[in-house]
């Protein structure tokens, strides 16, 4: 399918945040692929072509209960795929991948991310989204909840790591057992992945050895959280009070005004300082401004690098040390407004909103091209309506913010700027995510 690029120029707006977020002068985007089914992570191969994962729409096979145990079951099929985008044409070059989804094709677990190593070998992460106890028992042998190594020429693949089974056997965060790996990064001979269901960051060698958790992320304690009105439609009824019911009873040890919510890590990138940076989607009730970016040091200790975001789905560094963060929605998801944002954070802490709404809706992942453009999977939760956008005009630099700028420089900015002054420019690299 050849697409005629539809280019839309958008004046981005200033988004208020404690860091003094600024707006870029203008950003434009073109649609380079559409008609995707639950589009996820995307990545450039060494030959310059762009690849995107499609989680599919499940199928008519066996089913498993949702993570909450309430609501419609998730049913299995082989509708997952990897799609190649080359010279304006899209081609599904890997098909028949496992997929798990609700009856209407939403809420899909399936191919969620793709990466290429230095030799051009691809790896694909397959999501799941339920209790791994039911995976093999209900569905038989599938590659849901695993990292695989595909062969595009033969439309086949081999399993590299079983992340779902690791959660079942180890449960690093000590909470409810669940697995939904969403994104990963290649770091030498290691694959480093986030499991949104297990709330942890894991690593495994490319030869399948030494699968282990690096860190489990803590729950967040919300004070006076805002909940959806009773009766709000939801695929997870346990999250929404029934008619006439109020959320009154906190978990043990919390005051009535407090509520414990899951961290839900969603994406991972390796920073210029060698640490891993992890985006947080947040759990129900998806507090606005409640999402963080964690920094995970070499010793496995995590700290909050930046906060004040809403429902982050991905993040990525460019070759200049700028960090790009992707918001799935600027408001709590239960409000029904899925306008998202792409936010750029400079090494000095400055935040610039490159694009907010205006066609950017429930985006799921991003990557940076060798051309300096940002590529985003858009409408990633809508089967058949998913897109890949190319966002341009992203280089305007606003004045730095104060408080967060000092924090960011203290964290890694000075080291990065010093490195830039005393080394040759890095060659362009392209990495991706969810």
Would you name each region that the model predicts?
Residues 61-78, 133-143, 196-197, 285-290, ...:
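Short, solvent-exposed loop/turn segments at conserved positions within beta-propeller repeat blades
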Residues 414-434:
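C-terminal membrane-anchoring or membrane-association module
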Residues 85-89, 151-155, 205-209, 296-300, ...:
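Short loop/turn segments that connect beta-strands within beta-propeller blades
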Residues 51-54, 123-126, 193, 277-279, ...:
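Residue position within the beta-strands of beta-propeller blades
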Residues 28-33, 91-94, 100-104, 158-160, ...:
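A short beta-strand motif characteristic of beta-propeller blades
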Residues 35-46, 78-79, 100-122, 166-191, ...:
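Beta-rich, blade/repeat-based domains predominating
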Residues 78-83, 145-148, 200-202, 292-294, ...:
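A short loop-to-beta-strand structural motif that recurs across blades of beta-propeller domains
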Residues 397, 401-420:
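A cross-kingdom C-terminal cell-surface attachment/processing module
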